[in-house]
C-alpha cells in the first residue's frame, strides 16, 4: 500500500512530469558517497532550484543545491577540491549533498532539523530549539512536528514541509516506498 495516492497510469504520469529526476547520475553518486537517500536529495533540489543549474536566489544562493558561496567554499575545502565551479551540476550536487549530510550528523541525525538548517542556518535552528523548549516548558526531545510549528520564519517552516512532501513523492514514484513512512522517517 502507498497511502491514498491513486496509482493510475495517467495520474502517475502527471506526478512523474511534476517530479522529474534530472541530474540523476550526479545525485545518485553524491547520495551514495555521503549516505543520503536519493529521494531526499531529489526533493531538496526540486524545492531549491527545480533542477536549474544556473539559478541564483535573491540572497545569492547558487546552482542546483542553492548553496551560498561561503558554504560552497567551506565544503570544497573540506573535500579538498581545487577550483570548484558552483554552477557545475556534479560539483554543486556533490557539495550540497555533503553539506546536508553534515547537517544531519550535527543535528542529532534529524532530517527535519537538517532541512531547517539548510534553509536558515544551523545557528538559528539551535537557537529556535532552545527557545522552543524553554517557551513550552520542555527541556528535551521536543517532537519535530511540534518544533516545526514554533519556527518563527514562515519561509523555513514551509521549506521543510515542501522538501519532505517532495521526498515522499519521489520515494513513492521511483523507489516503491510508502510516502507516509518517508514523512515519518524525516520528521
Q: Locations of the language-model features?
A:
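Catalytic glycan-binding domains that act on GlcNAc-containing polysaccharides
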Residues: 1-187
Amino acid at each position: 500500500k502507498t497511502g491514498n495516492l491513486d496509482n493510475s497510469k495517467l495520474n502517475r504520469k502527471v506526478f512523474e512530469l511534476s517530479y522529474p529526476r534530472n541530474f540523476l547520475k550526479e545525485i545518485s553518486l553524491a547520495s551514495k558517497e555521503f549516505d543520503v537517500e536519493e529521494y531526499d536529495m531529489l526533493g531538496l533540489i526540486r524545492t531549491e532550484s527545480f533542477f536549474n543549474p544556473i539559478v541564483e536566489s535573491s540572497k545569492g544562493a547558487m546552482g542546483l543545491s542553492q548553496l551560498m558561496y561561503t558554504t560552497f567554499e567551506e565544503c570544497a575545502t573540506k573535500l579538498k577540491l581545487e577550483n570548484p565551479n558552483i554552477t557545475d551540476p556534479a560539483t554543486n550536487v556533490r557539495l550540497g549533498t555533503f553539506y546536508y549530510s553534515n547537517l544531519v550528523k550535527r543535528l542529532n541525525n534529524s532530517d527535519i532539523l537538517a532541512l531547517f538548517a539548510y534553509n536558515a542556518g544551523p545557528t538559528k535552528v539551535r537557537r529556535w530549539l532552545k527557545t522552543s523548549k524553554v517557551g513550552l516548558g520542555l527541556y528535551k526531545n521536543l517532537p519535530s512536528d511540534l518544533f516545526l510549528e514554533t519556527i518563527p520564519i514562515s519561509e523555513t517552516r514551509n521549506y521543510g514541509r515542501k522538501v519532505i512532501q517532495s521526498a515522499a513523492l519521489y520515494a513513492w514514484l521511483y523507489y516503491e516506498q510508502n510516502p507516509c513512512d518517508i514523512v515519518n522517517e524525516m520528521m
